[in-house]
Amino acid sequence: MLSALRTAGAVGTRRLASTQAIASNSEAPKGIATTGTPFLNPSSKAEYALARLDDVLNLAQRGSIWPLTFGLACCAVEMMHFAAPRYDMDRYGVVFRASPRQADLIFVAGTVTNKMAPALRRIYDQMPEAKWVISMGSCANGGGYYHYAYSVLRGCDRVIPVDIYVPGCPPTAEALLYGVLQLQKKIKRKREAQLWYRR
């Protein structure tokens, strides 16, 4: 009886191990480690160490995103909902800042006019490096309802580079939360130390 239980347990363990191996192999493409590092087949210990360094730096940046509020129109109300206690963005490390010198993310929320474009560019230039931009709403993405107005910029990506576009008029706070989570995934895939090593 005892030997039959041991045999059944061993078979169950083997099945579990084989299904876990299949799951891990099917999730990651060939040659990419399961940790998500983009270094393919590191050939030296230095490359491996730099890949782990990138993982640690990306984890720190991903866990402490400090956005700058740049509300220009009605999308700013949804950005305020996003910052309110209902969504509790502090658990993701999102802490709003009022100064561009302390922020590493800017939410462009609303219609960007031609007069506001130089101010937006100046604020973007004042942010320290490793900076990201989330364009929020139809007006910031491409002009929206005011696309054909003479005084409206047809998308903030004509002035500053945009990382994530959040569609909607206005987008909900949940959509903005999804955009922040997508930005965190993008930060996770960064590989600055590895690219520096390859130069």
UniProtKB/Swiss-Prot annotation:
Keyword hit for 4Fe-4S: yes
GO cellular component, one term: mitochondrion
Domain of life: Eukaryota
Keyword terms of this UniProt record: 4Fe-4S, Electron transport, Iron, Iron-sulfur, Metal-binding, Mitochondrion, NAD, Oxidoreductase, Respiratory chain, Transit peptide, Translocase, Transport, Ubiquinone
Main location: mitochondrion
Gene Ontology biological-process annotations: aerobic respiration; electron transport coupled proton transport; mitochondrial electron transport, NADH to ubiquinone; mitochondrial respiratory chain complex I assembly
Pfam family, one: Oxidored_q6
GO molecular-function term, one example from the UniProt record: quinone binding
Cofactors: [4Fe-4S] cluster
Residues bound to [4Fe-4S] cluster: C74, C75, C139, C169
Recorded catalytic activity of this chain's protein: a ubiquinone + NADH + 5 H(+)(in) = a ubiquinol + NAD(+) + 4 H(+)(out)
Function of the molecule: Core subunit of the mitochondrial membrane respiratory chain NADH dehydrogenase (Complex I) that is believed to belong to the minimal assembly required for catalysis. Complex I functions in the transfer of electrons from NADH to the respiratory chain. The immediate electron acceptor for the enzyme is believed to be ubiquinone.
Family statement: Belongs to the complex I 20 kDa subunit family.
Assembly notes: Complex I is composed of 45 different subunits This is a component of the iron-sulfur (IP) fragment of the enzyme.
Alphabetized PANTHER family for the sequence: NADH DEHYDROGENASE (PTHR11995), NADH DEHYDROGENASE [UBIQUINONE] IRON-SULFUR PROTEIN 7, MITOCHONDRIAL (PTHR11995:SF14)
Protein name (database record): Probable NADH dehydrogenase [ubiquinone] iron-sulfur protein 7, mitochondrial
Organism, scientific name: Caenorhabditis elegans
Name of the encoding gene: nduf-7
